[in-house]
Amino acid sequence: MANSAQARKRARQATKARAHNASLRSRLRTAIKAVRKAIVGGDKAAAQAVFRTSMSTIDSVADKKIIHKNKAARHKSRLSAAVKAMAA
């Protein structure tokens, strides 16, 4: 239980930040799923278009430190490899 005014304010801020971070994390997951769905669908042009938009989302979430930059790079690398493998 937050007793001081400072602790009450920090509790309010933490709740707000947690909700915002959850929203960003959800956007990230949705973007990744969209690329995977396009890859499974087999339409290379659509997969590439979705891939480009999802890269922006992944980078922005990493810039805001919601996920580590290395995790973002790993996601981007694996999705890129999957999209490129569609041509082969």
UniProtKB/Swiss-Prot annotation:
Which terms does the UniProt entry file under GO BP? translation
Show the ranges annotated as biased composition (Basic residues): 7-19
Q: Name one GO cellular component term.
A: cytosol
Report residue spans for region: Disordered. 1-25
Entry keyword annotation includes rRNA-binding:
yes
**Does the keyword field hold Transmembrane helix?**
no
- A GO molecular function for this record? structural constituent of ribosome
What this chain does, per the entry, is described as: Binds directly to 16S ribosomal RNA.
Q: Which family does it belong to?
A: Belongs to the bacterial ribosomal protein bS20 family.
Which HAMAP family does the entry link to? Ribosomal_bS20 (MF_00500)
Protein name from the UniProt record = Small ribosomal subunit protein bS20
Q: Which organism is it from?
A: Azoarcus sp. (strain BH72)
